Swiss-Prot record:
InterPro entries: Restrct_endonuc-II-like, tRNA_endonuc-like_dom_sf, UPF0102_YraN-like. This is UPF0102 protein SGR_1878. SUPFAM superfamilies: Restriction endonuclease-like. HAMAP family: UPF0102. It comes from Streptomyces griseus subsp. griseus (strain JCM 4626 / CBS 651.72 / NBRC 13350 / KCC S-0626 / ISP 5235). Belongs to the UPF0102 family. NCBIfam families: PRK12497.3-3. GO terms for molecular function: nucleic acid binding.
């Protein structure tokens, strides 16, 4: 795995831990199909959450939370629909798409930010 892949994996590990600490149950990670990948699928009570994780090393780059624009949001919605079609449809509590941004500074602890219902 290259450095970029390792950074992304580290960010996803932190995001999964953050979601679990918030009371969610992570049920799948890095789900792939021909249309793309969903980083994390989790259950939050009766709701199903599709979570995109964006990790950046330094604040000199675009903030991780700014990395999901309209095109990316549309793709996430399409991926969620495909996942639901393959797994029996939406749960009674509904579906939402969340974003976890992870900023890994050169020194100090990483900073995570969780935005619920971004799309």
């Amino acid at each position: 795995m290259n450095a970029r892949g390792a950074l992304g994996r580290y960010g996803e590990d932190l995001a999964a831990r953050l979601l679990a600490e918030a009371g969610m149950a992570v049920i799948e990670r890095n789900w792939r199909c021909r249309a793309g990948e969903i980083d994390i699928v989790a259950r939050d009570g009766d709701a199903l959450v599709f979570c995109e994780v964006k990790t950046r090393r330094s604040p000199g780059f675009e903030h991780p939370m700014a990395a999901v624009g309209p095109v990316k949001a549309d793709r996430l919605r399409r991926l969620a629909e495909i996942w639901l079609d393959r797994h029996g449809g939406p749960p009674p509590g509904g579906v939402r798409i969340d974003l976890v941004g992870v900023l890994v500074p050169r020194r100090g602890a990483p900073v995570t930010e969780h935005a619920r219902g971004v799309s």
